């Protein structure tokens, strides 16, 4: 039987004949420890409350499946989406130039050992980033009231 990587590569060929369907991300080894991800989100430890590089207070209870942003009037980074430039400060990514070779070597070895393709991972898209900066309800309201 082929590896998930081999099945995926067969699947994307124009006339490919994969031996079976793959489950969602089965063919991918997700690299979660790249320098940018570690820099932006690396301080999220189970059982703690911390601030990320965006200034969002993050709670990660022991019994929770993942970290969640904490929003109170004094902790919300972006209380008014129409004035986001005044309160949201993008982290300086130029400081993330170290550690790429080690990350690449370690991640590639893990992917090869599992017979998978190596993939980067970024779990925070535009909606999720807004949710972290201004809260879930305020994000939904802002998207409705200010679609541009």
Question: Which residues make up each language-model segment?
Answer:
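Catalytic cores of TIM-barrel enzymes
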Residues: 1-148
């Amino acid at each position: 039987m082929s590896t998930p990587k081999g099945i995926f590569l067969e699947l994307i060929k124009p006339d490919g004949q994969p031996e079976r369907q793959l489950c969602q991300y089965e063919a991918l080894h997700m690299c979660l420890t790249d320098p940018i991800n570690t820099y932006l989100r690396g301080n999220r430890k189970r059982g703690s409350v911390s601030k990320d590089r965006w200034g969002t207070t993050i709670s990660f209870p022991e019994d929770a499946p993942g970290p969640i942003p904490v929003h109170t009037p004094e902790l919300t980074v972006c209380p008014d989406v129409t004035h986001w430039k005044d309160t949201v400060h993008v982290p300086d990514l130029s400081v993330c130039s170290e550690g790429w070779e080690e990350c690449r070597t370690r991640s590639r070895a893990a992917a090869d050992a599992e017979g998978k393709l190596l993939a980067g991972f970024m779990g925070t898209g535009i909606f999720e980033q807004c949710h972290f900066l201004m809260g879930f309800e305020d994000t939904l309201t802002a998207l409705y009231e200010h679609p541009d």
